[in-house]
Amino acid sequence: MIKQYFKQALSQLKQQPLLTTISVLGTALTICLIMVVVMQQQIKTVPFAPESNRNRLLHVKWMSVGNKTWSDDGSSNGPMGIKTAKGCFEGLKTPEEVSIYSIPGTMQVSLSRGVRTGVDALETDGAFWRIFDFSFIDGKPYSDAETKSGLPVAVITESVARLLFGTATNVAGKEIFVNDAPYRVSGVVKDVSSMASTAYAQIWVPYLSTNITGGDNVWNDGIMGVMQVVILARNSSDFDVIRAECERRRLAYNAGLGDYFVFYRGQPDDQLTMSQRIWANVQPDMAGYFRQQVIIFLILLLVPAINLSSMTHSRLRQRVAEIGVRRSFGATRGGVMGQIVAENLVLTLMAGVVGLLFCLLISYVWGGTLFADSQLMHLNTAPVIEWKMLFKLSTFIYALLF
């Protein structure tokens, strides 16, 4: 029976090639657009290595500080200083881990004090390596003790190791120069896609091995700086409890700041909210975001559906004579309708396959532009896009059903 439906669908394609082709391509384009839009959102929230725990992560990207002597709406906004990160978040009891790390930056690496290469860098603590699941090719991450001691150790990516040493193995323990300072390579990890917006870098070093926590990198009595915080909950159901604990720590921290006081603007954020928090002084409007997504999907679904329905109506009108003949030879109304529906489902399935191919082609050719994080566009490397990061079978099925 199914084979017969396919034959009849192909027959319709031959009899009405223009209408059928437009119908198939229109449906395919709709499915393609829906999948691309969904994947643009998924890449920000769906777990993939090394951010496999995204569903359990909370983020504090920005901090706001006010002063009792400033105007009512006066505030300084941006990354926090190490003093604030430790005072408000270090040692939280509810979560599994808390990591303090720097905003993305660039460091110069070399094997000598001669020719240097710029690479994307993060400065972290030891907990960072327990939150994110990097794949180590050689060596291991630096420890909490090495971080607290400010030892000059570094983890580098496979591509950086090959650039410096010509190989990614047997590199641990060797010396490199980072911003003209000697560092020991602690480990080598597989290259990380910049789509992993929190974990991504090409080199990671302990934040106490540089001057990033002092000097010109802090202001407002050390309250503000260049640090951020990521929290790994034991379970996503603990998010509200963790936020409440963070609020208690904030109040206790403010008690020792004199005229200054810090506030979170709704943070810590889950992964989705964090992806929409662009500005340090503006809390994201998540209700508006969801409304916008609904409107986009309605437009993507309704406009092609209205156009395609008129084409389907034209096709059916041309088959009125055929339907009349079949009815006169004893075919039931339900049987005729069922066959027409089945034929249209076959055409929809064909369109779905074409739409999937369109989507994969677009993702392959323009993926770096479509899915790049605008906040990381200044980095040295182009975004690495892998199919397993983007394509979910459920996305294709939902797009096909709608």
What is each stretch, according to the model?
Residues Q15-K44, Q283-A321, L349:
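Hydrophobic alpha-helical transmembrane segments of multi-pass inner-membrane transport and secretion
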Residues V37-Q108, I223-Q228, L376-N380, V384:
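Membrane-proximal extracellular/periplasmic loop immediately following the first transmembrane helix
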Residues G78-P141, D259-Y260:
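Short amphipathic beta-strand/extended segments in non-transmembrane regions
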